[in-house]
Each structure stands twice: as structure tokens, then as C-alpha cells.
Amino acid sequence: METLILTQEEVESLISMDEAMNAVEEAFRLYALGKAQMPPKVYLEFEKGDLRAMPAHLMGYAGLKWVNSHPGNPDKGLPTVMALMILNSPETGFPLAVMDATYTTSLRTGAAGGIAAKYLARKNSSVFGFIGCGTQAYFQLEALRRVFDIGEVKAYDVREKAAKKFVSYCEDRGISASVQPAEEASRCDVLVTTTPSRKPVVKAEWVEEGTHINAIGADGPGKQELDVEILKKAKIVVDDLEQAKHGGEINVAVSKGVIGVEDVHATIGEVIAGLKDGRESDEEITIFDSTGLAIQDVAVAKVVYENALSKNVGSKIKFFRI
């Protein structure tokens, strides 16, 4: 038997945002219903970064994403994040595919934001604010475009050049957009934060009633993007409670005792599955705390793999003498 090898370029050609959103939504639902396995992430920590092992089993596949985070890599001509996915058959354990997962990590994160807003934002949301205009902002925008009729985008980034580039991207797609201060960008229907900040970049007084926030940036202990006062008055929905408590947007507030895990309303999977309510009024502030789950990675890898087989894309290698 042979294992399919898929490069980043090939992976990018094999899955759309629509496919990713469908896969991620179903993954969240299955996990909430107890129909998926996902052990905790395993970390190897080094002086200049870390490696993380992220395993999961769902939808007839098992998979492991092996991903690094080395902030100093750009100085060496390497990406900060590089990821591989090994996709296995649960029946035999055979490695069906080894593929790039760098692109799909960004894609599934964006997809999760779109799905969360679908269930938690006001249906008539039209003004979208972005705090942080790096790569992930584009994936968030593309997912949100598939759920809402976006009338206006307000963009803020500490690097004005990045904000201007994002605004141009929006305008090229027929969306009215402008560079704004963080305070003005926060005054919107849906706010997306994608920064690596360790101190709040969004103040409580900036956020109006009825706002939905996709809090994407916090991905480790000590990171936070939102004033804890926002968390205290919002309906908080997480992708996974344990991961969110460890390194999501709520981690600082929970560790300081400002809020407790009992203040988390639900997981997004529980909302999708109908086990918990989503938005219940036009006045409440809702927050989606996204940490990124292995179930998302396996769900999108399934789509990539099956599309590759049907389109005869990729190369094959025989690892074992069998």
C-alpha cells in the first residue's frame, strides 16, 4: 500500500472556504455529541519556540497535526508556523496521507470564525471591525462574507501598512473599507481580533450592546486581547473549555479569578447541536473564544484527501515493506 503525499500548493487547490466551513461546523457538532475523540495537545518547548502534537479521530479518519511556533523564524528565512498532517485509517492505522497543514490551519481557523458568527452574531450585522490585519484577518473575512452581507469594514493594525493592504483587499471585492483607530474599529456589529497581544487591545467602553466578537488571537497562557470587563458582561462561547482555560481569550481572566469556568455559556459545538442557546437577544454581547482544535484539522484533511483521490492529485510513496 502507498501513502499519498500532498504539498502546500496541492492542498490549497483541493479545498474551498465553503468546504472548510461545512467540515468545521460538522466537526464541532460531532464533538459536542461525543462522537469524536480529541486528547489534549502535547507540547515540546524549546528556547526559541515549541512543537505541538494535535491528535483527533472523527468522520472515519484519525489524524495527527504536528505544528511548530518559532517567532524568530522569519529572520532565518523560514515561516513562524509550519505544520504537517498525518491522516490514518482507524481500522488499520495505515497512514493514508501526509500533507501540508499550514494552509489548512489558517483556513479552518477562519472557517470557525464564520461558523461562530453565524450562530452568535445578529443576523442583520453589516459593519465589521478588524483589530489586527495579518494573514488570519483575510481568512476571517472570507468566511464572514459567506454568512453576511458585509456593508462596511473598519480596519486597525499597529502596522498601518498592513491595515491599508487589508482595506485594499476589501475594496477590490466591492466592500466599503477604511483604516480606523482601534476604538472606532471596535464600534461595529461583528469584531474580529487576531493579534498576539498580552495586554488588552479592546477596551470595554468601546464595545456596544449587540456586538459579537471573534476572539482569535490568544493562543497561549498570558495572552489576551479583550478588557476583562467585556468578558464579565458577555455571553462567552468557546471551542473547547480546557484549551480556552489554558490559553484562550479567557485564560488570564480565569487565572486571576475575575471570571470562572462556570461563566462560560457553552461550546460552539453545543450551540450548533442545539444543546445550548446561541444569541438570545439583539442587545447581548457575545464572544467566541477560538483556540483551534485538532478535530478541525482532521475534518478539513478529510476533505483534502478525498478531493485529491477524486482528482488524482499528489504523489505516492511506499513507506513500508508490505
Swiss-Prot record:
Enzyme class: oxidoreductase
Statement: the UniProt record of this protein carries the keyword NAD: yes
Coiled-coil parts of chain: none
Reactions listed under catalytic activity: L-alanine + NAD(+) + H2O = pyruvate + NH4(+) + NADH + H(+)
Residue positions of the active site: 65
Temperature-related properties: Optimum temperature is 82 degrees Celsius for the reductive amination of pyruvate. Retains 30% of its maximum activity at 25 degrees Celsius. Completely loses its activity when incubated at 90 degrees Celsius for 2 hours. The thermostability of the enzyme is increased by more than 10-fold by 1.5 M KCl to a half-life of 55 hours at 90 degrees Celsius.
Binding site for NAD(+): 108, 135-136, 157-159, 217-219, 223, 290
Keywords per UniProt: NAD, Nucleotide-binding, Oxidoreductase
The protein's assembly and partners: Homodimer.
Its biological purpose: Catalyzes the NAD(+)-dependent oxidative deamination of L-alanine to pyruvate, and the reverse reaction, the reductive amination of pyruvate. Its physiological role is not known. Cannot use NADP(+) instead of NAD(+) as a cosubstrate. In the deamination direction, can also efficiently use L-2-aminobutyrate as substrate. In the reductive amination direction, also exhibits high activity with 2-oxobutyrate and oxaloacetate as substrate. In contrast to bacterial homologs, does not exhibit any ornithine cyclodeaminase activity.
The protein's name: Alanine dehydrogenase
Organism: Archaeoglobus fulgidus (strain ATCC 49558 / DSM 4304 / JCM 9628 / NBRC 100126 / VC-16)
Lineage: Archaea, Methanobacteriati, Methanobacteriota, Archaeoglobi, Archaeoglobales
